Amino acid sequence: MNRREFNQAALLAGGAALFGAAGFQLGAPSKAMSQTLPTLPDPEASGIEHIVAVTMENRSFDHFFGWMPNADGQQAGLTYLDTKGAAHATHSLSGDNTGCPGKDPDHSYTGSRVCYDGGKMDGFLLDTANDRYCIGYYGEKDIPFYAALAQNYTTCNRYFASILGPTFPNRMFIHAAQTDRLTDSILPTTLPTIWDRLAAKNVSHAYYFNNVPYLALWGTKYLGITRTWGQFQRDAAKGTLPSVSFLDPRYTILDDGTGNDDHPHADIREGDKFLYNVFQALSKGPAWSSTVLVVNFDEWGGFFEHVPPPRAEAANSVDTDIVNGKTLLGMRLPVVVASPYSAGNPNSPIINSLVFDHTSVLKLVEWRWGLQPLTPRDASSDIYNLAYALDFSSPQTAVPNLPKPHTPFLVVPCFENLTGLFSSRAAQPGQVGAPSSSAQKTALWGDLRTMAQKNGFPVG
């Protein structure tokens, strides 16, 4: 079975699982599929020498990638009821690059469960913190570079956030395979991380950032491995990137149009441009032939999604919604794996339908360099190693000619509470002009940036 045949079979099996076919757990891969997984090579002989993970912010699969053929996406034609029983249809956001002034959709631990609604996935407008912005969607032409990257490489359409909750808990999973909080908080943490495992095995590693280093939550512990976006570009150009690199975008600290993380109300054209620059730096560098680039999103941002997340092995007891030792994953994310080992055909894009989450990236790192799992989550068979999204039989080092992002364009700041400047997208059921949770989130990033600066991080 070659990779394309395997991915097609996985898509069919995954779809059957989601509809509760006999012998399947909701959203989980089938036993039959686990028996037909391709055999992974010896890690040291795999050809992979560099893994780069870039984590954007707050978009669901249907919202960003629902247009993609054969990927189980849905966009137009869905309707959701609000708290008054009125039906609202999903709508295109094309041309509205910031979503301003729609409210930053609720994606808190509690609000997410209103949207999830016991797996019915119909509560996005039953959450009173939301307006119609949360059921809007973008098309292929709105994110030309990222859309083309997805179609020329491998898209994961069953990659879920690690917890049904907000940014900080999910980003903690990205580094630690667990979280010690259910809310966005800058309280310091001491959780062991993948960086500790890499250091113990003398595997080179670095964390790169733009304006706020998330690793500052660990105090000064990881100051020595933290580098700037400019350094990432230089290292990629020279072929001196370490074995493992995680890269964060420019977080949307203010609604001033300068963020490139895709978090509302950042301009998605800025995010597309950032990802283009990341890919150019890697694919034009001397180490591209041995590199795997993973572009994921920390969580779904409260945007509509029709596929209910499955449960997976609990990493610890912080998430109290545990059923038979398993907790809910978050919603699906628009994730792409770009590498000579994941190249595809844009006329028939590769869709991988195995169940992944953020610990799948950690599993890939652990597999490649012989590291022990951090928690029961990344040790679990509930979640697959992202290596199964790769084809080791015939790497294709030729780089496709991908479209450039929309440039140049005018950056327009978004001010949520300016009366009279609101579009119909912000109409009922949300209150027009009401403050959204983005104000709290941006203040939090600002506080973390200040804390990092005091601890000596190169935040400028």
Regions found by a protein language model. Name each.
Residues 5-460:
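N-terminal pro-sequences and low-complexity stem/linker regions of secreted or lumenal proteins
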